[in-house]
């Protein structure tokens, strides 16, 4: 999924994790990250694990200083949003070149993490936590 913006190729990808959804654009540039109009460092609270997660697909292909990442993300918390951005960036890189798919897939950047919060059941305090058992 690519389009042209001012004679530059733009590659789109969508990522999801828990309840977060990220729409990612990759544009040839110098490696800056913008998330919801803010810098990536600022948006992710300078958390190195979240920043590394966002940059992981580009690092896998050695393109960390070749593309700018522009993201619109909503829903969930920072961890879910960071992983959604990672998946969206990986999908956008697959649009860049079909050869990128294999290394990204072996690193696990293209797979959707199916884990999500388990619902609370009636009669219990939380999803699995029951009240204290009394024998007598």
Curated annotation (Swiss-Prot):
Matches recorded under Pfam families: Ribosomal_S9
Gene Ontology CC entries for this record: cytosolic small ribosomal subunit
Keywords of the record: Ribonucleoprotein, Ribosomal protein
Molecular function terms, GO-annotated: RNA binding; structural constituent of ribosome
Chain positions covered by the region annotation Disordered: 95-136
Compositional bias (Basic and acidic residues): 99-116
InterPro entries found in the cross-reference section: Ribosomal_Su5_D2-typ_SF (IPR020568), Ribosomal_uS9 (IPR000754), Ribosomal_uS9_bac/plastid (IPR023035), Ribosomal_uS9_CS (IPR020574), Ribsml_uS5_D2-typ_fold_subgr (IPR014721)
GO biological process, alphabetically ordered: translation
Record field: compositional bias (Basic residues): 117-136
Alphabetized HAMAP family for the sequence: Ribosomal_uS9_B
UniProt-listed PANTHER family: RIBOSOMAL PROTEIN S9 (PTHR21569), SMALL RIBOSOMAL SUBUNIT PROTEIN US9M (PTHR21569:SF1)
Protein family per UniProt: Belongs to the universal ribosomal protein uS9 family.
Name of this protein: Small ribosomal subunit protein uS9
Organism: Prochlorococcus marinus subsp. pastoris (strain CCMP1986 / NIES-2087 / MED4)
Designated gene of the protein: rpsI
